[in-house]
Amino acid sequence: MLIFAICILGAMSTWAKEKDSDSLNYEHGGSIWEVDNIALLDNDIKNEIDCTIENIITPEMSDYDKVKAVHDYIVLNCEYDYENYVNDTIPQDSYSPRGVLINKKAVCEGYAAAFKAFMDELSIPCKLVSGKASSNGDFTGRVNHAWNRVEVGGVWYQIDVTWDDPVPDQKGKVRYKYFLLSDEEMNKTHLQVRNEKKI
């Protein structure tokens, strides 16, 4: 059995795959789902991704253009689930691509998982990263956080779609402060505490 686990915002997420099985089990906060693909939890999410790609991606786009289009789409169409975050009542969907794509509200794990799901569909190498984040670089006592690494033009960059989405939500506003940063740049505010996993 292959098992991958990360702890985000104080809750453990676990992906497990039996050796001779095509399905995966996803567990978060005590709930377990069997999924056909680790990033695409069900058909309506896959359909939403496919439809979105059809609308925002064109054949002549470079990988950079595709990454930017997906980044912008997520920021413009999802709102950080701040109210549930501060009340410690985050629903399961907010940790997944479903929160971003269907409910239009998510926390960092949902943003990162949705971004990875898009990259998987576009065949752009991408990894989910977990760690801690702090705008001032002081990681003492900071909450867990999730973001991504993505390969563009043969170079790996870090990207935090969550932190590029203004809170409170500002319709039509996209930031690029955490868009395709080098490891050195991202390490000023983000501390990876686990090995990144390609999922």
List each model region and its residues.
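Sec-dependent N-terminal signal peptides
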Residues: 1-5
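Secondary-structure boundary elements
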Residues: 39-100
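Low-complexity, acidic Ser/Thr/Pro-rich repeat tracts that form intrinsically disordered stalk/linker regions
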Residues: 17-47, 51
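Catalytic cores of secreted or luminal carbohydrate-active enzymes
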Residues: 182-199
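Sec-dependent signal peptide cleavage junction
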Residues: 8-20
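Short pre-catalytic strand/loop immediately N-terminal to key active-site residues, enriched for Gly-Thr
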Residues: 103
